[in-house]
Amino acid sequence: KWSGTMCLTEPVCGTDLGMLKTKAVEQSDGTYKISGQKIFITSGDQDLTENIIHLVIARATDSPPGTKGISLFLVPKFIVKEDGSIGPRNGVSTGSVEHKMGIKGSATCVLNFDDAVGYMIGPKNKGLSQMFTMMNLERITVGVQGLGISEIAYQNSVTYAKERKQGKTNNTKSTNGADFIIEHADIRRSLLNM
């Protein structure tokens, strides 16, 4: 019912996360007001799930500069009420949908955090190590996902080649018209090179 995102990259810092500008201001109730902008957020906004939980790295006002002062925050798209039901919209908005080559099925967004309510996860100033613990698993997951997609593409191609008839080959004894395309040498070569 809910989905999640990882919000690291900002317009001012790509790989140098120590330069991030997103701020976290502690409130009297223990929550934080998160303000800043994140870019390249996969599935950053969509209406397929009831809520989106954003994991956001930000710097608390009294934290040191650089990567040693980064904390991790849970920032929901919608505030969750005490009874677990969905409450009002949080201060998270979509600035734009990214226009990157090859992205057609993913709402990769620019997200704006405007005094959004956030909840610190884990110890203060340890957010980067927490985020990268999760990201290390995600790197493996993305690789396995790519392997799965390529495997099903290959299997579907072989199935189709065994069902589709087109033209005649010289190495079959079929007399009833066209041959299955898997009998064609170039199709077999293409399948071997997939």
Where are these regions (language model features)?
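Short Gly/Pro-enriched turn/cap motifs at secondary-structure boundaries
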Residues: V12-T15, D45-D47, P64, K100-S106
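A short core secondary-structure module
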Residues: T31, S35-R89
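Beta-sheet entry/capping signal
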Residues: S3-T5, G30-Y32, I53-L55, G69-F73, ...
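Alpha-helical interface subdomain recognition
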Residues: D16-L17, Q27-S28, N112, I140-M194
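A glycine-rich, basic-preceded beta-loop-alpha segment at the flavin cofactor/substrate interface
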Residues: F40-T42, I79-G95, K100, A107-E138, ...
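Short beta-strand elements
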Residues: G18-V25, I57, L111, D115
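Core alpha/beta catalytic barrel or barrel-like domain that forms the active/cofactor pocket
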Residues: W2-E10, S71-L72, R164-S174
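Gly/Pro-rich turn-and-neighbor structural signature
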Residues: K1-Y32, I39-F40, H184-M194
